[in-house]
């Protein structure tokens, strides 16, 4: 049984040292240079007393130094916590404390003093000018050891740390390669944040495959199209809003592109039809932080025939649909359950959540769906109430808990509303103790929530719709509203 592997970056630098690992802005970095830069950062972190077994959080925008930081953690034997740059300070502080992080790697674009009372903050730009401490790097990765921790909001509204092992990341990369293929010409463009699994997973594919990553700090349709043509990019990870922008900007898919891996929810028919007309090879997918990226993928040849399907499981992965403890027949609706070597080890320090989420080795996703008679998966509802806005996940319970802490709010319900630009945005439905303005509630949320989680509109109700068990019926909120707060 495979229990350990040589450090991926170390071995890749030995195998193909002069091959291009990373292109970022005007920087071109070979695998040998990537290893040297990451090892140097590891030695500089060691001079700050970062040691094997520690936990370090990373709060950085997409940039070369973030890539170095992730690999430096692995070379030190340190668990890396990837923090979402869009979150509020309040949200990040919770994750730092909950994860047991002792160090925070960041830069001048973030206010370090806001975190100094609970962690040692290290500015990576200052760090790279400092002296280093000679270390013995961790030459091997233990497959069952936690490599990264990413936080995902749960239905209770409290974020949970997803423990992703080296084995999870490795088998995710291998399963993806068996599905999408690999060529020596492949270059994968990432304009999604590296703190999301869809972005981070490409870094690991890079060192495992020996493939170039073309990294962008953020998505700009003109910059991405220029980069695709300049660097002959063959693959790109995207969400629906990115794909729509690319389609608006060009009449034909760039010749070098062979795969657009689409995440963040099923694509609508008009978008898929336009992709087919313009020759965009879209691979729809279904996955989550807990599965270390995609676990189900639909190839372009099935995109119209199996409209709305997320596809079939990757090699070594399994899916099934269950309802009331019984496996469902084809087309019968139930909960999607997944199993495979890329499925997370567990939620960090969440015993009750782990007991509720795992059943005989299967992960209960909380998503509803069905399989057709050929085994293609159709996702009916993303974790029933999840709002996907511009590729970002918004859990109503998390937003509701913030609104309920406001003195004017007696009850709160949040659901998604269609939005032309973002796909969906959150709307809040409130029962009030006393009058309050939408502006006051927006300002209150700004201090406690990421910008994309703040409700776009607030509505007043006499009472929230609930079932006999007093469970909030979010799908009925829109019909129960009385008037909009201004």
Swiss-Prot record:
* Record field: catalytic activity: 2-succinylbenzoate + ATP + CoA = 2-succinylbenzoyl-CoA + AMP + diphosphate
Tell me which UniProt keywords the record has, alphabetically.
ATP-binding, Ligase, Menaquinone biosynthesis, Nucleotide-binding
A Gene Ontology biological process noted in the UniProt record is: menaquinone biosynthetic process
Top enzyme class: ligase
Supply one GO molecular-function term: CoA-ligase activity
Question: What pathway does the annotation place this protein in?
Answer: Quinol/quinone metabolism; 1,4-dihydroxy-2-naphthoate biosynthesis; 1,4-dihydroxy-2-naphthoate from chorismate: step 5/7; Quinol/quinone metabolism; menaquinone biosynthesis
Highest taxon of the lineage: Bacteria
Q: Where is the signal peptide?
A: none
Q: Does this entry carry the keyword Ligase?
A: yes
- Give the E.C. number(s): 6.2.1.26
Task: Report the function annotation for this chain.
Answer: Converts 2-succinylbenzoate (OSB) to 2-succinylbenzoyl-CoA (OSB-CoA).
Q: What's this protein's family per the entry?
A: Belongs to the ATP-dependent AMP-binding enzyme family. MenE subfamily.
Q: What is this protein called?
A: 2-succinylbenzoate--CoA ligase
Q: Which organism is it from?
A: Bacillus subtilis (strain 168)
